[in-house]
Amino acid sequence: MEEKTISFITSVKICKGYHDFGHRIRLYIENISFHCKKCNIDFEVLIGEDVDDKNEIFLSEILSDDFLKKHNAQIIQTQQSSYKNPLKYNMLEAPNKNACMYKSKGKFICFTSGDVLMNSEFFDYIHKFQENSFYRFLTYEVKALDCDFENAKLDYVLDYCSRNILRCYNDTY
């Protein structure tokens, strides 16, 4: 197994009300790929996708095999219904991310939501990571994007986000 410096792991289920999430995931992957390649970071992106009859569309219908290969990304399909869940909680995140973590090759693992975009400061810091450490990074909430996610370009979205910050969370490393 070829070890990577870092595995980026997220979770998704594209069902009613989340039709644009596949395109948000596309931007998420492009953002990671762009910055990791720029900073010479060996990486992989793993997306756990819960699949059942509630899916309106599958991620593989939005992201081509060529796109995934170009950006070192992989879709790992899971079925939430296969996990014991006596209290019937929505367990989308845990089973999906656990399945990805099991398959990950990264020395470090970064768990995020699929609509998170990280800035260059985050990627610059990856080279400083130390084993057996937990890192939490500053996050910003921004206004809703002013264009259609399906046609959004990464550079435009990053610029838009930097100009439309609503609030900031957790300024700690």
Describe each PLM feature range.
Residues T5-T10, E44:
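Cell-envelope/extracellular polymer assembly enzymes that use nucleotide-activated donors
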Residues T10-L27, V51-D53:
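Active-site beta-to-alpha loop of glycosyltransferases that engages the nucleotide-sugar donor
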Residues I25-I41:
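Short, acidic, metal-binding catalytic loop of nucleotide-sugar glycosyltransferases
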Residues I41-D52, I76-Q80:
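Short beta-strand/loop segment that forms part of the nucleotide-sugar
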Residues F58-K103:
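Active-site-proximal specificity loops/subdomain of glycosyltransferases
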Residues M101-Y102, N119-Y173:
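Conserved catalytic core of nucleotide-sugar-dependent glycosyltransferases
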Residues I109:
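Short aromatic/hydrophobic "clamp" motif used to bind/position activated sugar donors
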Residues S113-L117:
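The conserved acidic donor/metal-binding loop of glycosyltransferases
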